[in-house]
Each structure stands twice: as C-alpha cells, then as structure tokens.
Amino acid sequence: MVADFVAHIGKKLPDDVVAKLEELGSQETAALPKALYETMTKNQKLAVELNRPSCQDTGVLQFWLKCGTNFPYINELEGLLKEAVVQATFAAPLRHNSVETFDEYNTKKNVGKGTPTVWWDIVPNSDKCEIYAYMAGGGCTLPGKAMVLMPGAGYEGITDFVLDQMTSYGLNACPPLLVGVGVGTSIETAALNSK
C-alpha cells in the first residue's frame, strides 16, 4: 500500500496545488506566464492519463512519521518504508536518484545510506501512525540555502535573506515554486522547520 502511495505522489500533485495553478493561470494576462501555467496544467493531466511521473526528477524520498509508541509495526516501519521505495521505483517508475556519495555509484533503487530519510515524531501511549511523504528532487532543493543571522537582524534580516535567495537562486528551481522558510535556534532546526 505504501509503495502504491509513493508511486502515486510522483504522478499527481495535491489537489490544492493543481487548483491554485489553474486559478493563477486563469488570472494571468501576460503571454509567457500564461503559457507556463498552461504547460504545467497540461503536464499534470498527461502524467495522470499516461500513468507516468509528472517530473523526470522524482527526487529522493523523505518521510515524516507521527507514530505512537504502541503502534504494532513501529520496529519494522523504517524497513517497510525502504522496501516501499524500492517497489515504487520500479513500479512507477521513479528515476534512480539515490547515490552513495563517497562510493560513487547509483544504487538504482532509490535507497542507500540515510535514504530514504525518515524523521520521527513519537507520540506516547498511541497506537496510530501518520506517514507524510515528500519527493525532494534537485530542481527544488538546488536553490536551498541556510544561514545563521546575527541576533539583531530581526524580521528585516530574515525577509532580506529570503528575498535575496528567491531572486538569486529561485530562477534555477523547478516550477511551481513553493517556498519553505524555517527559523530556528540552529541550522538543522531551521532546515527541518522549512519543510
């Protein structure tokens, strides 16, 4: 079931994103932006009709788990997710993106050391588990940047940093652009908050 879900999200954008693209496209009057919205909408429709990923770079899978301590499969969950990624890679098919960096080879299964990435939120005395999946391709993560600002920079410093990144590096990102901004006490916390 999880493998089917992973394959599905590689082919279909969330309904709210599709609706927003159609809404923005209908409001656009300039020729080039209107053509871009039409292309994204057509691409999404074709991906669903042809049962193919909507992007060639389906990314490296990341999972966020909100899992109860009494969930019956808590001990097997990471292994099950890894196996689901392998199955989805061949069934969808998803592009083989997972590379063992220092060994310099592609696993061809989208799994490897630390891949897929799994973040845990453990809920005491619960037997429920929620799984959130995200495909982080190079086109969306390439322009990502983290920075430690001086405490006195305040909201203005954050705003300046975000706008500078969007105008400098956002040009290289794949549309539609969804900007995540995380503010935290460390770079690691801020990066996770931005997701």
Segments (PLM) and residue ranges:
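Non-transmembrane, aqueous-exposed alpha-helical and coiled segments at domain scale
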Residues: 1-195
